[in-house]
Regions:
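Catalytic alpha-helical scaffold of carbohydrate-active enzymes acting on polysaccharides/glycoconjugates
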Residues: 2-140, 146-164
Length: 164
């Protein structure tokens, strides 16, 4: 999109960031979910494209993803978190998982707004703690199809996330 400069002329800005979110399970299809990840990674490397990979909790605990992601050059690839709730993120807090699979696309199971403020904070802390355990730092980027204001405020203040 052209940008108007102070002198009244236009300059062209080219900004592109490819964002891929990674899940540990996909119950809606029989597709091997590792294959699309490997293909996305291949295409980004082949075309020298920068991008971000956001890991859902079940992907964060999958060494297939994390072993590959840890080896990527940080100047080309950013690693962050995808904050949808999965069964394995509920278990440590005694929260009953009511989804049909270990990840369920229905909002009353997978979106943070379905849980109390206290549970949302605990889930965020678990997600960020475990990310740091794997990668050695807290993520700066976070994504979700739907994220509530309380979780955004909590995460922004505690973990200094700067990209949603």
């Amino acid at each position: 999109m052209p940008t108007l400069t102070l002198k009244g002329t236009y300059m062209k800005r080219n900004i592109l960031n490819i964002v891929n979110f990674l899940r540990g399970t996909e119950p809606r299809t029989d597709t091997d979910i590792h294959k699309p990840f490997l293909e996305q990674l291949r295409l980004m490397k082949e075309n020298n494209l920068r991008g971000t990979f956001l890991l859902q909790y079940d992907a964060l605990t999958d060494p297939f993803y994390t072993d590959i992601l840890k080896e990527l050059p940080p100047e080309q690839f950013e690693i962050g978190v995808w904050f949808e709730v999965v069964e394995s993120l509920c278990a440590p807090f005694g929260v009953e998982w009511k989804g049909r699979w270990s990840w369920d696309y229905w909002s009353e199971f997978s979106f943070t707004g379905a849980y109390t403020f206290d549970v949302r904070e605990k889930m965020a802390d678990k997600l960020f703690h475990d990310f740091k355990e794997v990668f050695g730092y807290y993520p700066r980027s976070l994504g979700a199809w739907c994220l509530d204001a309380h979780s955004i405020a909590y995460i922004s203040e505690k973990y200094d996330v700067d990209a949603y």
